């Protein structure tokens, strides 16, 4: 019998979509089901990338599947006897998947399976009658850092280089932008086009660190002189920026433009689903002493939660 493993749920798709509105903990089954249908019909595909499918297969079968692909955007990976792909890619190669895999998808993501089968053209009555799977908890483990927090949402570990993990992260914008340079993975993030002052938090460091003398991009963990004065000025700048932001919104200004006045200390939240080989690369680079302190703390937290295996060393660069 084929070994098949899945990570995620119907709700996982909804969470990764609703994070755009900072409402990823909100649950309403009927609305959730309608949202899955809406995402599918309107080709909002990224939330489907956080559900992962792995099944045992011979490498020859995987190569045969790849040879039949006509869509160059589809990504299907092979590692240590298992095929890995996310649900978005599975939908795009649906006719090539083994029937047993489709049956497991039906069991694990029943609402989503119903939507896939109807290509989104499913009426409310039938949609509401479908089972709906939920995550057992918002996070399995959570670690606070000086600038935010990270939670382990889920993991699929088969002792391969392509084991998968999903995290939810809250951090300053400048940390998120560094984070998203790690491109082998999937992201969904709070959008300030949608969310106004209901999600408006800022990171304020305890002190302003000194610039490193020999490393142009690094700092020394010592306060500069008059650090307290500058921290106070930053607080004032944040306060003035928020006031201006709110004034623009109150006058009917678009949030997508008003957000431009908010400083980089503003926090964001995002979901990150990542394979082990990319995760290990993140840990290697971001625990280095030259990495920024704030993101280094997150990398150390990840290492504490799921360990480091060194799979990234297989890459030359």
From Swiss-Prot:
Cofactor(s) demanded: FAD
Reaction(s) catalysed by this chain's protein: dUMP + (6R)-5,10-methylene-5,6,7,8-tetrahydrofolate + NADPH + H(+) = dTMP + (6S)-5,6,7,8-tetrahydrofolate + NADP(+)
Domain ThyX: 100-317
GO MF annotations, alphabetized: flavin adenine dinucleotide binding; NADPH binding; thymidylate synthase (FAD) activity; thymidylate synthase activity
Entry note: cofactor: Binds 4 FAD per tetramer. Each FAD binding site is formed by three monomers.
Keyword NADP in record: yes
Listed pathway(s): Pyrimidine metabolism; dTTP biosynthesis
Residues annotated as binding FAD: 46, 181-183, 189, 281
Keywords per UniProt: FAD, Flavoprotein, Methyltransferase, NADP, Nucleotide biosynthesis, Transferase
Residues holding dUMP: 178-181, 189-193, 259, 286
Record motif ThyX motif, residues: 181-191
Active site: 286
Region (Insert): 55-166
Residues annotated as transmembrane: none
InterPro entries the record matches: Thymidylate_synthase_ThyX (IPR003669), Thymidylate_synthase_ThyX_sf (IPR036098)
An example Gene Ontology biological process: dTMP biosynthetic process
EC numbers: 2.1.1.148
Keyword tRNA-binding in record: no
Subunit structure: Homotetramer.
PANTHER family: FLAVIN-DEPENDENT THYMIDYLATE SYNTHASE
Similarity-based family: Belongs to the thymidylate synthase ThyX family.
Function text: Catalyzes the reductive methylation of 2'-deoxyuridine-5'-monophosphate (dUMP) to 2'-deoxythymidine-5'-monophosphate (dTMP) while utilizing 5,10-methylenetetrahydrofolate (mTHF) as the methyl donor, and NADPH and FADH(2) as the reductant.
Protein's recorded name: Flavin-dependent thymidylate synthase
Species of origin: Aquifex aeolicus (strain VF5)
